[in-house]
């Protein structure tokens, strides 16, 4: 299947150094708000790439649940493939893609677990069925069929009809960035790329060639 004729010219916006915030987290928050206002589909969805102890990269899409001065927060099963990869190699790369705005944001950094209190607070805010699912799903494990999963979910619901506690193998991570890049599509593939990199605890802002 040939795909070389599929292309699009980007013309909607531009990105200049002088209009970028000094702090990349502030710049990200600005872009995220604009993505939400523009009704981008799943504006908080981000691809997260990890590398396990075997040296092989894997990626998947998860949802950003908080962004703050420290970094980017998401939640998952610690025993999942991504959880095992992060235990062996606590670094990750994130990518947000907002095609409606012809934008993407790349983030690289060190990953640490959130404390149990924060994980408990977020877990308690989830819908009941999602909390049940966190117990029922042994994420990334091979199962014989969907009925196995449904049976586990029914058992958990029967055991916890009102309140489902957080499983010890489920909780949050924060990606503490050392690099954040903002990409704005431009005509003729002369895209705008503004990268922030952390140098001696100070963010250095620079333009990259597309």
Curated annotation (Swiss-Prot):
GO biological process: pyridoxine biosynthetic process
Cofactor remark from the record: Binds 1 FMN per subunit.
Domain of life of the organism encoding this protein: Bacteria
PROSITE patterns: PYRIDOX_OXIDASE
EC nos: 1.4.3.5
Gene3D superfamilies named among the record's database cross-references: Electron Transport, Fmn-binding Protein, Chain A
Pathway involvement of the protein, from the record: Cofactor metabolism; pyridoxal 5'-phosphate salvage; pyridoxal 5'-phosphate from pyridoxamine 5'-phosphate: step 1/1; Cofactor metabolism; pyridoxal 5'-phosphate salvage; pyridoxal 5'-phosphate from pyridoxine 5'-phosphate: step 1/1
Record: residues binding substrate: 7-10, 65, 122, 126, 130, 189-191
NCBIfam families: pdxH (TIGR00558), PRK05679.1 (NF004231)
Subunit: Homodimer.
Protein name: Pyridoxine/pyridoxamine 5'-phosphate oxidase
């Amino acid at each position: 299947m040939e795909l070389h004729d599929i292309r699009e010219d980007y013309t909607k916006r531009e990105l200049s150094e002088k209009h970028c915030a000094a702090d990349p987290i502030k710049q990200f928050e600005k872009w995220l708000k604009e993505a939400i206002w523009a009704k981008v589909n799943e504006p908080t969805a981000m691809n997260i790439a990890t590398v396990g102890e075997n040296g092989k990269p894997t990626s998947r899409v998860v949802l950003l649940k908080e962004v703050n001065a420290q970094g980017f927060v998401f939640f998952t099963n610690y025993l999942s493939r991504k959880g095992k990869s992060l235990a062996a190699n606590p670094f990750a790369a994130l990518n947000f893609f907002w095609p409606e705005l012809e934008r993407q944001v790349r983030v690289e950094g060190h990953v640490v677990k959130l404390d149990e209190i924060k994980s408990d607070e977020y877990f308690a805010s989830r819908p009941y069925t999602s909390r049940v699912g966190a117990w029922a799903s042994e994420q990334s494990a091979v199962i014989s069929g969907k009925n196995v999963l449904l049976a586990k979910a029914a058992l958990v619901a029967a055991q916890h009809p009102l309140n489902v506690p957080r499983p010890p193998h489920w909780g949050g991570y924060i990606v503490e960035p050392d690099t954040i890049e903002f990409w704005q599509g431009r005509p003729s593939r002369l895209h705008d790329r503004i990268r922030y990199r952390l140098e001696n605890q100070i963010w250095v802002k620079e333009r990259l060639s597309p």
